[in-house]
Design a protein with these regions (language model features):
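Local beta-strand N-terminus motif with an aromatic residue
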Residues: 88, 109, 152, 199, ...
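Glycine-rich beta-strand-centered segment in the early N-terminal region that forms part
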Residues: 28-45, 55-98, 118
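Glycine-rich cofactor phosphate-binding loops and adjacent beta1-alpha1 units
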Residues: 149, 202-281
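Mid-domain Rossmann-like dinucleotide-binding core that forms the NAD(H)/NADP(H) cofactor-binding site
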Residues: 134-208, 212-213
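Glycine- and other small-residue-rich loops at beta-strand/loop junctions that grip anionic moieties
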Residues: 111, 134, 157-158, 182-184, ...
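Short glycine-centered segments of the SAM/dcSAM-binding site in methyltransferase folds
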Residues: 90, 154, 180, 247-248
Length: 362
């Protein structure tokens, strides 16, 4: 039998709003429901979701709330309806983000419950560190691209070195059959990163003629699809202009005019898209969670297929995460890493979080 402690030292926010910087607090180890896994979390990663939840508590959970929704670790308990996973399986998954995550101090790992359709078995050849940086960003790219990209199409993905962007570029270029994948970045390093991920062309988006360069790459026609995961209203308007007549504009998150949950700004995106008969598609992973959200069978299958694809495509070498930095599971390191994400200072790839001093399983 696996010895499961009653509590652990979680990392998260303890106030309802303005909860950043994060702190540590004792939390009971959660119990899995019928269709859930309890995972001892060995590795995770940082996402903007964590500091936004700490700032805004937009799911309305009563603090203290543990954060850390990317999880890779070992199944130590499971609900009675779970048949696809066994105790001791190495897994990767996404913790329920309207609940609690799995960050913890002390180097002994954290604990998180994961819905079984948001988990996949981790192949032995993939490290817990690599697996632990994938779930949220991979599912965001998968949700934004997989249902919409058709073979041979042209696609523009700004920020192709970012956490979502570098995975989206690989996905579009290497697995979905896009004919032309174009990206952009502000530094030589990040432009090279996007190119290494498979982008056929990468431009400097700060260039005065960036839009002209992008349109020229499509021979003046515009892109079949623009996938914008930047959370920038300025970028939203630019990418909307770049979509061809009748094309698709896919946005990650809450969409134009709502780049944060506390403010609504005027946006011209809908007007721009309507003028050319283009479609506005919202790809928001968080739409599957929160108040009153029920995930139907089709959505569960889609998410499960996405999690399995994250491991399969990694094993095949076609979509692999770029880890820019790895930090230990200390409050100071996590706060520092989240602050760098908040400032969006030319970052690239993912920041991994090691929650255990050893990657050994049971």
């Amino acid at each position: 039998l696996i010895d499961i402690p009653a509590t652990y030292d979680a990392i998260g926010y303890i106030s309802d709003g303005n909860g950043f910087p994060l702190t540590s607090f004792a939390r009971p180890v959660p119990q899995p429901k019928d269709n859930e896994l309890l995972v001892r979390v060995l590795s995770s990663s940082l996402n903007p979701l964590e500091f936004k939840l700490a700032d805004l508590n937009f799911f309305g959970n009563k603090p203290p709330v543990a954060l850390g929704f990317d999880v890779a670790g070992v199944v130590i308990a499971k609900g009675r309806n779970v048949t696809d996973f066994a105790i001791g399986d190495s897994v990767v998954g996404m913790a329920d983000c309207d609940g609690h995550g799995g960050w913890a101090t002390g180097g002994q790992g954290g604990y998180a419950v994961v819905r079984s359709y948001l988990a996949a078995k981790k192949p032995e050849a993939i490290s817990f560190q690599d697996a632990g940086v994938l779930p949220i960003c991979f599912l965001a790219a998968y949700l934004g691209l997989k249902p919409h990209v058709k073979g041979g199409e042209t696609i523009y993905i700004p920020g192709g070195a970012g956490g979502v962007g570098h995975l989206a570029v690989q996905m579009a270029a290497r697995t979905l059959g896009a004919g032309l994948v174009v990206s952009s970045a502000s530094t030589d390093h990040n432009r090279q990163t996007a190119s290494d991920c498979g982008a056929h062309a990468v431009i400097d988006y700060k260039s005065p003629d960036a839009s002209d360069q992008l349109v020229d790459l499509t021979k003046g026609e515009g892109f079949d699809i623009a996938f914008d995961a930047t959370y920038s209203e300025k970028s939203f308007e630019q990418t909307a202009h770049l979509v061809r007549p009748g094309g698709r504009w896919v946005v990650l998150g809450v969409g134009p005019g709502r780049t944060t949950r506390t403010s609504v700004t005027e946006s011209r995106v809908d007007q721009i898209l309507a003028s050319k008969g283009a479609t506005n598609i919202n790809a928001n992973v968080l739409s599957f969670f929160g108040e009153g959200k029920l995930i139907d069978g089709d959505a569960q299958v889609f998410l499960s297929t996405g999690m399995e694809a994250s491991m399969r495509w990694h094993s095949e070498g076609v979509v692999r995460p770029l880890i820019a930095k790895a930090v230990n599971g200390s409050v100071d390191d996590i706060n520092s890493g989240l602050q760098s994400l908040r400032e969006a200072s030319g970052g690239y790839g993912k920041i991994a979080v090691a929650l255990s001093s050893s990657e050994s399983s049971y």
